[in-house]
Amino acid sequence: MLFATLEHILNHISFSTISIVITIHLITLLVHELGGLRDSSEKGMIVTFFSITGFLVSRWASSGHFPLSNLYESLIFLSWALYILHTIPKIQNSKNDLSTITTPSTILTQGFATSGLLTEMHQSTILVPALQSQWLMMHVSMMLLSYATLLCGSLLSAAILIIRFRNNFFFFSKKKKNVLLKTFFFSDFYVKRSSLKSTSVPSFPNYYKYQLTERLDSWSYRVISLGFTLLTIGILCGAVWANDAWGSYWNWDPKETWAFITWTIFAIYLHSRTNLNWKGTNSALVASIGFLIIWICYFGINLLGIGLHSYGSFILTSK
């Protein structure tokens, strides 16, 4: 009972804090004079991280196994993984474009996890025999870390497409303030442009947009490369575990099939980066398609509750 109460408190603290962080981001986006509030949002993300970490540790202690046995626990872990990605630019002292992706993604995953749809999964249960293995933590954690990483990289690629073709979208048309550009700190370039007007340094209209898209493209490539590596490790660990549990390394289960499709899509993306004719818009399009594939692989199969990987699915639990 004590652990359940602690989990409930920590879960709601993390969700409330990340909601405040999102609000601060929106305020600083609309009111430039309040840019100093960004420090508060970073502190909020730290509070969120420790709250989610405390939740996972508490869940682990109460259940006796790492909390990755159902959709609810995996969503909480996914939120935790998104924060880890959020801190990478901080460590490298780089411009934190990732925060524009990781912060909203964290609140969405956290929000769905705490919604009424997954209430029956909130109580920790004993693992079914097939999941009582040392491979549970290794395989599932690697897969979820890869999902979080690939989702962020895919969204960065989608942002590149929107910036390059924003005139084709009503929301991002020139008649309106381009929220996306401001979100990625594109205002920095306006300051530089105004300072260059009084100098002899040449400039051209699309130079600043080019700098932004190149920076996002670089981040997208690095993040997806990391995610692809984690996905490969996760699939290999799963194959070894499958051989121990079911006597076969690969069964073309729906989850396995979509994991293979996901791996193939991002392998195509990485290969397209080596071809100058595909690098840029074409590779970003491939990565954006990968975003949908990941959600089908991770979320769609769990909702349907089919195949050998249906443990902890929404349908099975709701029955």
Swiss-Prot record:
Required during biogenesis of c-type cytochromes (cytochrome c6 and cytochrome f) at the step of heme attachment. Keywords: Chloroplast, Cytochrome c-type biogenesis, Membrane, Plastid, Thylakoid, Transmembrane, Transmembrane helix. It comes from the Eukaryota. InterPro entries: Cyt_c_assembly (IPR002541), Cyt_c_biogenesis_CcsA (IPR017562), Cyt_c_biogenesis_CcsA/CcmC (IPR045062). This is Cytochrome c biogenesis protein CcsA. HAMAP family: CytC_CcsA (MF_01391). One of its GO terms (biological process) is cytochrome complex assembly. NCBIfam families: cytochr_II_ccsB. It comes from Lolium perenne. May interact with Ccs1.
